[in-house]
Amino acid sequence: MTTTVFTSESVSEGHPDKIADQISDAMLDAIMKQDPKARVACETFVKTGMVMLGGEITTSAWVDQEELVRQVVNDIGYNHGDLGFDGETCAVLSSIGKQSPEIAQGVDEYEDHEQGAGDQGLMFGYASNETDVLMPAPIYFAHRLMEKQAELRKAGKLDWLRPDAKSQVTLRYEDGQPVAVDAVVLSTQHSPEVDNKDLHEAVMEEIIKPVLPEGWLHSGTQYHINPTGRFVIGGPVGDAGLTGRKIIVDTYGGMARHGGGAFSGKDPSKVDRSAAYAGRYVAKNIVAAGLADKCEIQVSYAIGVAAPTSISIETFGTEKVAVSLIEKLVREHFDLRPKGLIAMLDLYRPIYQKTASYGHFGRELPEFTWEKTDKAAALRADAGL
């Protein structure tokens, strides 16, 4: 028996970097509601009392940027001055230009030119059969802890909870499958009056125990709840936030490789985002079809060129048929050209703000078409299984 451990982390929607991601994707959604094929690359910076937007946007849409920013910040929970960051009073600055025409000429579709990739780059997709949603278990449970913290905070059940929080989960694996929780770290911002003992007890009983599988918790499990002692100063007061700084939280928690490109604030012509979503779709269908227990796909592109420059499959020795056959089936069943994958996943929709917290993958919402396993039956049949 082979025993290993693996750790992944998540952060809450009130974490400064996630505030930035949500604002960037809210801008994208607001534009796509009016102009689905707009070119959007929206970056956000947040710090005490300030939100700054930047990037390149080419669109016919008009969006009240200030109103949108304030709405997002307030909805997250930064809605009064005691938190040091308030959607009603923060400054909103903007420095947004248009997409370079040199980029546009390679990406736009016109006579004798198919839509090309918005940039060069490499993207990965991953799936594993260790959870029902075919995600790595450490990141899956780290996200669920953060969702639970937000649920309790917004419901007022633990009225001392504040928006900023982080989680980290270390799981023990035996022969490639998770069997136990070896460590949990949960840090949550709180109001100053709460007693440390009460906080520890509430986090354990109301957040950790309801989320993590009871059979995985054991006498040796380490619990680190607000290990610095106090966490009153948080959000953009404690740390600056920037779009695209939580790319491992957004994906597979480090269990799979990452091409380096962030997602939030980018329209589907940017393969950093759309091809990573397509990669998840491919990998999940391969695992759902039973062709492998684990699957990682890499795709790469050249700017302005439609066809991927490479497609490769890694199954970590868990394949049930030849990897060469899996690669052949991927090419036959999935159109990974920019235009093809956008159509395949119906990505010209204002669905992106929902992706910007608690993970882009592993949440089977109707809008998240890349989580469907509708290709699994055909893949399995064509593989002869």
From Swiss-Prot:
Keyword presence, Cell membrane: no
Chain positions recorded as L-methionine binding sites: E56, Q99, D239, K270
Entry GO CC: cytoplasm
Presence of keyword Nucleotide-binding: yes
Keywords linked to the UniProt accession: ATP-binding, Cytoplasm, Magnesium, Metal-binding, Nucleotide-binding, One-carbon metabolism, Potassium, Transferase
Pathway(s) the chain acts in: Amino-acid biosynthesis; S-adenosyl-L-methionine biosynthesis; S-adenosyl-L-methionine from L-methionine: step 1/1
Catalysis: reaction(s): L-methionine + ATP + H2O = S-adenosyl-L-methionine + phosphate + diphosphate
Amino acids binding K(+): E43
Cofactor annotation: Mg(2+); K(+)
Flexible loop as annotated region, ranges: 99-109
Binding site for ATP: H15, D164, A165, K166, R230, F231, D239, R245, K246, A262, K266
GO molecular function: ATP binding; magnesium ion binding; methionine adenosyltransferase activity
Database matches in Pfam families: S-AdoMet_synt_C, S-AdoMet_synt_M, S-AdoMet_synt_N
Localization (cell): Cytoplasm
Family according to the record: Belongs to the AdoMet synthase family.
Described function: Catalyzes the formation of S-adenosylmethionine (AdoMet) from methionine and ATP. The overall synthetic reaction is composed of two sequential steps, AdoMet formation and the subsequent tripolyphosphate hydrolysis which occurs prior to release of AdoMet from the enzyme.
Name of the molecule in the record: S-adenosylmethionine synthase
Organism, as annotated: Hydrogenovibrio crunogenus (strain DSM 25203 / XCL-2) (Thiomicrospira crunogena)
